[in-house]
């Protein structure tokens, strides 16, 4: 799986884009591919892991898994 950061996500339209960690073109993200319980959404700046496949208009993310960021212990 690749890693990246959510660039933006529109809840009303159900899609957004992910910036891949290694650079390159932004990757299309659809709510139906987000792997989580309840309301499936992403937030700008959120870290995610995902698989990439070629769609008709560019790269699409599939199996999007939000990455939990552990809080630093002082």
From Swiss-Prot:
The keyword ATP-binding does not apply. GO terms for molecular function: nucleic acid binding; protein homodimerization activity; RNA binding; single-stranded DNA binding; toxin activity. InterPro entries: Cold_shock_CspA (IPR012156), Cold_shock_domain (IPR050181), CSD (IPR011129), CSD_CS (IPR019844), CSP_DNA-bd (IPR002059), CspD (IPR012751), NA-bd_OB-fold (IPR012340). Its main location: cytoplasm. Induction: Not induced by cold-shock. Stationary-phase and starvation inducible, as well as by oxidative stress (30 mM H(2)O(2)). Repressed by MqsA and MqsRA toxin-antitoxin system. It is found in: Cytoplasm. Residues 4-64 form the CSD domain. GO terms for cellular component: cytosol. Pfam families: CSD. Disruption phenotype: Deletion represses the production of persister cells. GO terms for biological process: negative regulation of DNA replication; regulation of DNA-templated transcription; regulation of gene expression; response to starvation. PROSITE patterns: CSD_1, CSD_2. Keywords: Cytoplasm, DNA replication inhibitor, DNA-binding, RNA-binding, Toxin. It comes from the Bacteria. Inhibits DNA replication at both initiation and elongation steps, most probably by binding to the opened, single-stranded regions at replication forks. Plays a regulatory role in chromosomal replication in nutrient-depleted cells. Binds single-stranded DNA and RNA, but not double-stranded DNA, through hydrophobic interactions without sequence specificity, resulting in a packed structure. Homodimer. This is Cold shock-like protein CspD. It comes from Escherichia coli (strain K12).
């Amino acid at each position: 799986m690749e890693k990246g950061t959510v660039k933006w996500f529109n809840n009303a339209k159900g899609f957004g884009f992910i910036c891949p960690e290694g650079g390159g073109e932004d990757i299309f993200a659809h709510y139906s591919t987000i792997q989580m319980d309840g309301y499936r959404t992403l937030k700008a700046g959120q870290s995610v892991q995902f698989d990439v496949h070629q769609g008709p208009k560019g790269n699409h993310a599939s199996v999007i898994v939000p990455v939990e960021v552990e809080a630093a212990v002082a």
